[in-house]
Amino acid sequence: MRSLVGLVAVIVTATFYLYSLSVFLPPGPQLHKQSHEGETTDAKDGDEPSEMETASSRLKFPSDLDELKEMAELLQFYKTEHTGYVLLLFCSAYLYKQAFAIPGSSFLNILAGALFGTWFGLLLTCVLTTVGATLCFLLSQAFGKHHIVKLFPDKVAMLQKKVEENRSSLFFFLLFLRFFPMSPNWFLNMTSPILNIPVTLFFMAVFIGLMPYNFICVQTGSMLSQISSLDDLFSWSVVLKLLLTACVALLPGALIRKYSTRHLHLDGLETNGLSQNKKNR
């Protein structure tokens, strides 16, 4: 009971912090509107509600591509004068999702590509993914170990058996689980402290193992921000970027799978129900 109270307190505190960031926004860039004489004048009090006046009501986790596009446009608007605040808001929202195992990080990865570009967006999402997963690890270690075992006894037992079988190659086993596209990352994050996986090993496996997945999402966001029509989608530059993305994403996984077939004991991972849909990653 005490562990549940502690977890609820952490969730409430984090939610209040994130809500405060989204509501008490700094003033956005000065808006202008066209007068009847053709001159540009500043928007004044009493005018129709501007974009920045309704911004707080539009800041929410995107659940589809339309909401994602609207969110990207709004944050790009604020980013022109408040880059630091937008970065703080994005990082806070990302860590909130990861720490509490909330699905939908792919949308935030795409948003990172649209806001910050491919390379900075990739570095940012890799760091945030790793830190957020580690926070989930620590929360599970502090508050949830007993409840997770109670809720998922068979899956925990099966994963515990596989970890012990691959203890001599534990890092590569963890990399395999992260590269494997159907592995539920939220479940791996929460069960790792139960399996006695060292936090440093966990940290490195998440950072490296989810890098290809993050790269695909960030590159998609970066490309979408540059595409204005369907014709742009089939340009040579876009096609080459897609091919490069596919190669970079598939190569590490192929190498790990080749290693795993020779050195790791993986029988039963899929048949015991560990695999799940990609959207729950």
Curated annotation (Swiss-Prot):
InterPro entries: TM41A/B, VTT_dom. Its main location: membrane. The chain crosses the membrane at residues 84-104, 107-127, 170-190, 197-217, 236-256. The keyword Transmembrane applies. Residues 32-56 are annotated as: Disordered. GO terms for cellular component: membrane. Keywords: Membrane, Signal, Transmembrane, Transmembrane helix. It is a multi-pass membrane protein. The keyword DNA damage does not apply. It comes from the Eukaryota. Residues 1-22 form the signal peptide. It is found in: Membrane. Belongs to the TMEM41 family. This is Transmembrane protein 41A-A. It comes from Danio rerio (Zebrafish). The gene is tmem41aa.
